[in-house]
């Protein structure tokens, strides 16, 4: 019934299996990939023909994690998987980026790649396996895909590169780098690092590229026995149109690209494009030799040819800069004084307002991942409204691009954050892109670094980012620093590098062509380092390190630790005690399983009141200490005072005042607030308090009362015996 084909190899000490022909046979391509005991199913379906007037390649990649893969039922009311998580979106992009450039130019059939994690062993991360399975399914499908590609993860532990480290090894690694490529070229890199130098990062890329070669061989072997016949697809021959357009418009396009202002340049190019379309489009459709889509495609190709040629020939950029110059930078902090921290970062025509907010444990984000529930204390959100590029558009939930750019900036900042123990706040940074002409994600990195320091977050060092580009024609190439939007779209590489003065914290690279050599990447990294140091120096004009004090509008958090067996006492039955503390003091209180208690409030007095309350529950009263209490009951022989949490003690009638007292209610009544001193414990372990030992107006000890001194001497003699009696009673 099934005609299956299977390839198995040993890869980084674990078996990798690729199988096809048994599952999802109606898809154009389907592969079950297994690594260790993690299993994914990748399918590819591509429409037989493009939609009418389709002017782009509609590729969609959907990566989805099934709860049953780890033996769990989804949470929530519906008990089923719903909208993609942030991680699913990021992995979808991770797969999309290296495969998209490998489709034959001009192919515009609707194509969908769906990858499902159907089993997870909690040891092998499924993202690399999903990338491999997607590539294999595309290679088998017959669509015009010039692959295969493969991916690998690289760690860096104890000075050694590690290929595909287990998930539990990653916390000890100074590097988390994912590389994807073909047999001859690296196509994509995504990484987070602990301030590693450029040579270590480049070595990791090359190590990963070498490590993925056996997987490429396995995919090719599978394709040799299981691939479908290639589809009949011949790219359109538009050479006649290209020649005619070049004669008609080349000089006008060159003139338009001498305009340095982005909006003016775009207006000139759009007007020229409209003029050319009108010239090539006759009045009647029957006489049309070329479609609007074909004309627009060739126009873009001519733009790229002119811009790229100018840069290679003159070493000058669209805006007049040389290859390594960074655009003018202006940094400001505290632009929104009532927020906890804020910054405005402007680099040329790219600008970001970044606002930092400090929160408590209640603000931590709970993330329900396949590996289990965990809490995230650092959030970075990137917003890209349409007005930032002078356009109209929809507003709503963030798209894949916004999520991806935000995560890149998160990776850049994350290694420099203080530990949770030294800075127990939840941190949220929001980047609002207000202008964009290239590298808004790196502007987010710079702005976030400044905003966090403005908020008083003690970053280990400031972080900056820069986007690099590449123009390559044959043996000639030019590496560009701080690229514009046009240089990104018309170039061969988008290479983003973020880090401190000491090293790289995040690196993202997308390459659109083959032939990017190790030497070119080395030049790009060194040039990026120079640019990064320059940007850090410009940022230092606004702020060099974290402010010593938090904003007056920030919450204050104090941390205390109690014994684990005392947690129940602080919480109380059904949460009664902790609710009362919160309601009465106004503080926010978070209790962790290890006995760590975080008390938060903007008011120091509120925090102190909550601390005293908690200490009164978990601590033992100290002999000789003075407490403020409340009279809860009076009797002929004295008054009972609630003085330490729920603990009551007796003030004997002889200890109510220095003078002789004949009636308790002459001195105190129920509900009165009084100061008492803990004198000790009687023979039965009962608390003995004194009011006459304390000045009731100031709460300070009365040192001139002879009877108090005598009482103190007697208590000091009795304390050892009383402690023995209490211990015996407890036993």
Swiss-Prot record:
Record Pfam families: KH_1, PNPase, RNase_PH, RNase_PH_C, S1
Looking at the record's lineage, which domain of life comes first?
Answer: Bacteria
| Cellular component aspect of the GO annotation | cytosol
The S1 motif domain, residue ranges: 624-692
Q: What is its EC number?
A: 2.7.7.8
GO molecular function term, any single one? 3'-5'-RNA exonuclease activity
Q: Does the keyword Transport apply?
A: no
Q: Give the reactions, separated by semicolons, that this protein catalyses.
A: RNA(n+1) + phosphate = RNA(n) + a ribonucleoside 5'-diphosphate
Which SUPFAM superfamilies does the record match to this protein?
Eukaryotic type KH-domain (KH-domain type I), Nucleic acid-binding proteins, Ribonuclease PH domain 2-like, Ribosomal protein S5 domain 2-like
Q: Biological process (GO) annotations? A: mRNA catabolic process; RNA processing
User: Which cofactors does the annotated protein need, by name?
Assistant: Mg(2+)
Checking SMART domains in the record gives: KH, S1
Q: Which family does it belong to?
A: Belongs to the polyribonucleotide nucleotidyltransferase family.
Name-wise, this protein is Polyribonucleotide nucleotidyltransferase
Species source reads Bartonella tribocorum (strain CIP 105476 / IBS 506)
Q: Which gene encodes it?
A: pnp
């Amino acid at each position: 019934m099934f005609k299956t084909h299977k390839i198995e190899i040993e890869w980084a000490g674990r078996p990798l299996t690729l199988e096809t022909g048994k599952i999802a046979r109606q898809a154009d391509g389907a592969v079950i990939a297994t690594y260790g005991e993690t299993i994914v199913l990748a399918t590819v379906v591509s429409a037989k023909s493009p939609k009418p007037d389709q002017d782009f390649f509609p590729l969609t990649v959907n990566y989805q994690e099934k709860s049953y893969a780890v033996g769990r039922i989804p949470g929530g009311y519906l008990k089923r998987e719903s909208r993609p998580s942030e991680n699913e979106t990021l992995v979808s992009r991770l797969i999309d980026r290296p495969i998209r450039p490998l489709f034959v130019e001009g192919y515009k059939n609707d194509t969908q790649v769906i990858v499902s994690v159907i089993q997870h062993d909690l040891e092998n991360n499924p993202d690399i396996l999903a990338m491999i399975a997607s590539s294999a399914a595309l290679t088998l499908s017959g669509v015009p895909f010039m692959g295969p590609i493969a991916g690998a993860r690289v760690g860096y532990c104890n000075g050694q590169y590690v290929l595909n480290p287990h998930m539990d090894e990653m916390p000890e690694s100074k590097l988390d780098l994912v590389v994807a490529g073909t047999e001859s070229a690296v196509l994509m890199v995504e990484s987070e690092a602990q301030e590693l130098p450029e040579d270590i990062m480049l070595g990791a890329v090359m190590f990963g590229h070498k490590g993925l070669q056996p997987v490429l061989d396995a995919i090719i072997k599978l394709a040799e026995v299981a691939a479908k016949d290639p589809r009949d697809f011949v790219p359109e021959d538009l050479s006649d149109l290209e020649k005619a357009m070049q004669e008609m418009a080349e000089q006008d396009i060159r003139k338009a690209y001498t305009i340095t202002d982005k909006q003016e340049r775009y207006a000139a190019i759009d007007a020229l494009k409209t003029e050319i379309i009108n010239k090539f489009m006759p009045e009647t459709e029957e006489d049309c030799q070329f479609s609007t889509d074909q004309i627009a495609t060739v126009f873009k190709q001519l733009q790229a040819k002119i811009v790229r040629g100018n840069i290679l020939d003159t070493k000058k950029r669209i805006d007049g800069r040389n290859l390594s110059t960074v655009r003018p930078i202006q940094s400001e902090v505290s632009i929104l004084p009532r927020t906890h921290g804020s910054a405005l970062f402007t680099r040329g025509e790219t600008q970001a307002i970044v606002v930092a907010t400090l929160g408590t444990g209640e603000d931590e984000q709970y993330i329900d991942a396949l590996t289990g529930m965990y809490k995230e204390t650092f959030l970075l959100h990137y917003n890209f409204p349409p007005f930032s590029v002078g356009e109209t558009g929809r507003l709503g939930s963030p798209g894949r691009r916004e999520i991806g750019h935000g995560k890149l900036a998160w990776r850049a900042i994350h290694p420099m954050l203080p530990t949770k123990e030294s800075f127990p706040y939840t941190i949220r940074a929001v980047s609002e892109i207000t202008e964009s002409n290239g590298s808004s994600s790196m502007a987010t990195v710079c702005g976030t670094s400044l905003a966090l320091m403005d908020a008083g977050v003690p970053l280990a060092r400031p972080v900056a980012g820069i986007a690099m580009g590449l123009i390559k024609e044959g043996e000639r190439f030019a590496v560009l620093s701080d690229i514009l939007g046009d240089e990104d779209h018309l170039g061969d590489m988008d290479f983003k590098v973020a880090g401190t003065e000491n090293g790289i914290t995040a690196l993202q690279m997308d390459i659109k062509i083959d032939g990017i050599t190790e030497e070119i990447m080395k030049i790009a990294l060194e040039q990026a380092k120079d640019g990064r140091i320059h940007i850090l120096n410009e940022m230092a004009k606004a702020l060099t390190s974290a402010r010593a004090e938090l904003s007056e509008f920030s919450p204050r958090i104090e941390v205390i630790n109690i014994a684990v067996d005392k947690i129940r006492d602080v919480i109380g039955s059904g949460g009664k005690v902790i609710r009362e503390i919160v309601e009465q003091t106004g503080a926010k209180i978070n209790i962790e399983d290890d006995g760590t208690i975080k008390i938060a409030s903007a008011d120091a007095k509120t925090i102190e009141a909550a601390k005293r309350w908690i200490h009164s529950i978990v601590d033992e009263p100290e002999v000789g200490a003075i407490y403020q209490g409340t009279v809860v009951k009076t009797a002929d022989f004295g008054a009972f005072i609630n003085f330490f949490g729920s603990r009551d003690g007796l003030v004997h009638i002889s200890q109510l005042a220095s003078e002789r007292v004949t009636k308790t209610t002459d001195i105190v009544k129920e509900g009165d607030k009084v100061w008492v001193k803990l004198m000790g414990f009687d023979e039965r372990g009962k608390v003995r308090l004194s009011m006459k030992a304390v000045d009731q107006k100031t709460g300070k000890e009365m040192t001139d009362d002879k009877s108090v001194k005598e009482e103190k001497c007697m208590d000091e003699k009795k304390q050892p015996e009383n402690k023995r009696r209490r211990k015996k009673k407890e036993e």
